[in-house]
């Protein structure tokens, strides 16, 4: 059985240091990241579905720190062009973790096409990206640790069950989060 998204997020947080930047996609995944561990170097995407991968790319191209993006299959499907751009730019400090639960988790778990005929690994590989799909928590952690220690762009597609952890809303106002994040990455 596939793991839950929150368990993947916990493994990400357990394995990053203080220097890594984490960008999380819209809605519940951002709330889950905040619930697991709020950090100044977390960027919580609160308003634009499909743009976390592009925001992470911009950060990776403009800083030396490792940038980890937590995105969903639904968000990636809304912005497939981001994979092509990431593959073209190919930043060595970029890890894209696609949580593939075959559902639009933040809007009620409506099914996405990845549960049928859309293969995100093949799409990402077609864009020139080093990509692997994991189906267990142990396999994900192994691949994520490897990616953290490599100097190359990596996409990890983590198959998960469609499940939303019950988490409260992020209590810090978005404008405060923005400035806190900007100050944190300026110091690196």
Swiss-Prot record:
Kindly tell me the pathway this chain contributes to.
Cofactor biosynthesis; coenzyme M biosynthesis; sulfoacetaldehyde from phosphoenolpyruvate and sulfite: step 4/4
The free-text note explaining how the cofactor binds reads:
Binds 1 thiamine pyrophosphate per subunit.
Q: What is its EC number?
A: 4.1.1.79
Cross-referenced InterPro entries, in alphabetical order?
Sulfopyruvate_deCO2ase_bsu, THDP-binding, TPP_dependent_decarboxylase, TPP_enzyme_TPP-bd
* Subunit comment: Heterododecamer composed of 6 subunits alpha and 6 subunits beta.
Can you tell me which family this protein belongs to?
Answer: Belongs to the TPP enzyme family.
| Function of the molecule | Involved in the biosynthesis of the coenzyme M (2-mercaptoethanesulfonic acid). Catalyzes the decarboxylation of sulfopyruvate to sulfoacetaldehyde.
Q: Which CDD domains match?
A: TPP_ComE (cd03372)
UniProt keywords (A-Z) are: Coenzyme M biosynthesis, Decarboxylase, Lyase, Thiamine pyrophosphate
What PANTHER family has UniProt attached to this entry? Answer: SULFOPYRUVATE DECARBOXYLASE (PTHR42818:SF1), SULFOPYRUVATE DECARBOXYLASE SUBUNIT ALPHA (PTHR42818)
Which EC class is this protein assigned? lyase
Q: Which GO terms describe its molecular function?
A: sulfopyruvate decarboxylase activity; thiamine pyrophosphate binding
- Does this entry carry the keyword Lipid metabolism? no
The record lists the catalysed reaction(s) as: 3-sulfopyruvate + H(+) = sulfoacetaldehyde + CO2
Q: Which gene encodes it?
A: comE
Q: How is its activity regulated?
A: Inhibited by oxygen when heated in air at 80 degrees Celsius. The enzyme is reactivated by addition of dithionite.
Q: What is the lineage of its organism?
A: Archaea, Methanobacteriati, Methanobacteriota, Methanomada group, Methanococci
Q: Which residues cross the membrane?
A: none
Q: This chain belongs to which protein, by name?
A: Sulfopyruvate decarboxylase subunit beta
From the UniProt record, give one GO term of the biological process aspect: coenzyme M biosynthetic process
């Amino acid at each position: 059985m596939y793991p839950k998204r929150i368990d993947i997020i916990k493994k990400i947080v357990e394995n990053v240091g203080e220097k890594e930047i984490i960008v999380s996609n819209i809605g519940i995944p951002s709330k889950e990241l905040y619930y697991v561990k709020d950090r100044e170097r977390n960027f919580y995407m609160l308003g634009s579905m499909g743009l976390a991968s592009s925001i992470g790319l911009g950060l990776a191209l403009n800083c030396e720190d490792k940038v980890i993006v937590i995105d969903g299959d639904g968000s990636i499907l809304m912005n497939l062009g981001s994979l092509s751009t990431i593959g073209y730019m190919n930043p060595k400090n970029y890890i894209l973790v696609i949580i593939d639960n075959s559902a639009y988790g933040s809007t009620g778990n409506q099914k996405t096409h990845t549960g049928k005929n859309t293969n995100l690994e093949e799409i990402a590989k077609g864009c020139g990206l080093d990509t692997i799909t994991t189906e267990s928590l142990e396999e994900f952690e192994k691949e994520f640790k490897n990616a953290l220690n490599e100097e190359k762009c990596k996409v990890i597609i983590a198959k998960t069950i469609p499940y939303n952890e019950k988490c409260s809303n992020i209590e810090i106002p978005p404008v405060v989060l923005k400035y806190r994040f900007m100050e944190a990455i300026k110091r690196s």
